[in-house]
Amino acid sequence: MTTPLTLVIGNKTYSSWSMRPWLLLKHLGVDFQEIHVPLHAPDAAAQIARYSPSGRVPVLLDGDLRIWESLAISEYLAERYPAVWPIAAEARALARSVSSEMHAGFATLRNELPFNCRARRSGVTPSPTTRIEINRVVAIWENCRATGDAGGPWLFGGFTAADALFAPVALRFHTYGIA
């Protein structure tokens, strides 16, 4: 019997980076253990350092192998679970492109609209720079929906890593009433 994967994360309510691989693993139906590190605990850095060479979460443990960073975790999972990315090559390439953009971009949106998926904030007016980033996210989503399998509800029809990576943004939009 193989040891299940272990995902080391912070609180999914506040840590969008922790939420991403957790969502992906759940949607894939993968058996995994979860280690929750309270990120505001005095010893959080020491707890994380036990698992993560980068000193950050998330980290996926597979035996002695440690994979940190949500996009790297997604790619590692794709080696075992082909449903991580769309089947069609063009859609798969687009999914990887927009996932990489999500991972590396949208810093103003992240800073101006902090992640808390349980909160509801009203009266927040995004700055012009954040509005540009919001518009870019919406354009990405529209393009993915036009490219993917229209038969499913997700960005490319079926749930993929792109959905897991963009889910916290969708939740931010809900939190702040962004239309």
Task: State each model region's role.
Residues 1-127:
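GST-like domain detector, emphasizing the conserved glutathione-binding G-site
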Residues 106-179:
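GST-like fold's C-terminal all-alpha helical module
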